[in-house]
UniProtKB/Swiss-Prot annotation:
Glycosylated residues in this chain: N81
GO cellular component, one term: extracellular region
UniProt record similarity statement: Belongs to the peptidase S1 family. Snake venom subfamily.
Cystine bridges: C7-C141, C28-C44, C78-C236, C120-C190, C152-C169, C180-C205
MF terms (GO), sorted A to Z: serine-type endopeptidase activity; toxin activity
Lineage: Eukaryota, Metazoa, Chordata, Craniata, Vertebrata
Domain Peptidase S1: 1-229
Organism: Crotalus durissus terrificus (South American rattlesnake)
One GO process term, biological-process aspect: proteolysis
Name this polypeptide is given: Thrombin-like enzyme gyroxin B2.1
Keyword Disulfide bond found: yes
Tissue specificity: Expressed by the venom gland.
Other comment: Negative results: does not have phospholipase activity, does not aggregate platelet, and does not affect the release of the neurotransmitters dopamine and acetylcholine in the nervous system.
Pfam families: Trypsin
Amino acid sequence: VIGGDECNINERNFLVALYEYWSQSFLCGGTLINGEWVLTAAHCDRKHILIYVGVHDRSVQFDKEQRRFPKEKYFFNCRNNFTKWDKDIMLIRLNKPVSYSEHIAPLSLPSSPPIVGSVCRVMGWGTIKSPQETLPDVPHCANINLLDYGVCRTAHPQFRLPATSRILCAGVLEGGIDTCHRDSGGPLICNGEFQGIVSWGDGSCAQPDKPALYSKVFDHLDWIQNIIAGSETVNCPS
């Protein structure tokens, strides 16, 4: 996160860190939505993933963090009214439930859709400088604004975004504050509700008039809840 500050240790209880297992390199963030399930971005997927829950400072090994592996991974493959931009979402079932603690607690799914103009909180261990990468040991947090989708469409002509989309657009139009590389998969929390997943942005982050794109959690609720409930057939939303 660019232009943010170190997160308060109590405001990131649901934030998880995804690593590539063999190289032990940090990949992405993710969000614990209950004891056994994590929501992140599909583009964070690797063949072998390690998930740390309850981490704050990545450089310090301490006994409060819990290590898990994906038992199952689910990708959103609905075609009707969804474009490729709307599908950057991955649901991971952990190999065993985590134990909640002082620094580990889930973030509940949203009860209503996000409202343009909302102030949203972002957080992650992504780079704090751009275009040079500087990865911090601790997660950084910042506030950005939920913008109209059309702003992102105009800002990123190279993406050729569709005229309408289920993707969220958020940032600070003056520049200086933004999610960036390796914040992917982490949460966008608007008015206290988990509304988005860090997806894509400009190569150089935090530029003026270049807000970033976030997968919209609310439009995937049925899919998420069906999978968690163990439903064999997952109906695509209309």
